[in-house]
């Protein structure tokens, strides 16, 4: 199954996010040690295109519980910068083959 995750960060959390960024990238690259397959993702920004306000990801996973487990183990979540998370299942017709995965 495929899922879209939208994560909003707490205002003023940029310094903590920057400090956790490398660990976050390792987590993403491993799919949370194989809990999910990360297809793509990126930061979400203000209209200026620079000020981070969150992030999104598209995942292949056995179910929503696995995506939640991935989010809960993310260094950004552990560091306390996550304000809210929305996880939405994508339709079976989603064309995942068009995306070069970020994790295996």
Spell out what each predicted region is.
Residues 1-104:
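Conserved, structured core segments of small domains
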């Amino acid at each position: 199954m495929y899922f879209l995750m939208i994560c909003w960060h707490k205002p003023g959390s940029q310094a903590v996010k920057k400090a956790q960024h490398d660990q976050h990238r390792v987590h993403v690259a491993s799919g949370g040690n194989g809990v999910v397959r990360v297809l793509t993702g990126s930061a979400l920004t203000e209209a200026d295109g620079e000020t981070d306000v969150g992030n999104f990801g598209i995942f292949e996973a056995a179910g929503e519980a696995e995506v939640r487990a991935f989010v809960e183990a993310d260094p950004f979540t552990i560091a306390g910068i996550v304000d809210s998370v929305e996880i939405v299942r994508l339709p079976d017709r989603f064309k995942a083959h068009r995306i070069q995965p970020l994790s295996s």
